[in-house]
Amino acid sequence: MASKFGYRLTKRAESDLDGTVSYIAIDLANPQAASDFVDKLLYNIEEARVFPESGSLVDNEFLQLENVRKKLIGNYIMYYLPNTVENIILIHVLYMVNKISLIFI
């Protein structure tokens, strides 16, 4: 896939990813699953870069940003914002079981 858009991560998304990968690799003692998660995440980021509007539009009246999109990655939800300067902004990566994820669904 040839990338159309670049991407960047918010500090929150960086923290989400660090915590998720650490939890899977160390707490669950499954580094292969952590690596698989990263591979799936990178695939979905690449897909969003090529097709920025491919994720489902998040419909939430309490969300202050418009045009936030989401992609499902196994048991996780990746929230991102395609913007007008030809990049996507990865906002959040949440475990779907977390009640906080219900706010964004």
Predicted regions and their residues:
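Arg/Lys-rich, positively charged N-terminal/basic patches that mediate binding to nucleic acids
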Residues: 1-40
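Short proline/glycine- and basic residue-enriched helix-capping loop/turn segments at helix->loop/beta transitions
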Residues: 49-50
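Generic N-terminal leader/processing signal
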Residues: 2, 10, 68-69, 73, ...
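Basic/aromatic recognition patch in beta-strand/loop cores that engages polyanionic ligands
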Residues: 55-85
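Short linear functional motifs in flexible/disordered or boundary regions
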Residues: 25, 29-32, 36, 53, ...
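Residue-level signal for beta-strand positions within conserved beta-sheet cores that form or flank
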Residues: 3, 66, 87-90
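Enriched for short, Lys/Arg-rich terminal
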Residues: 28, 73-77, 81-105
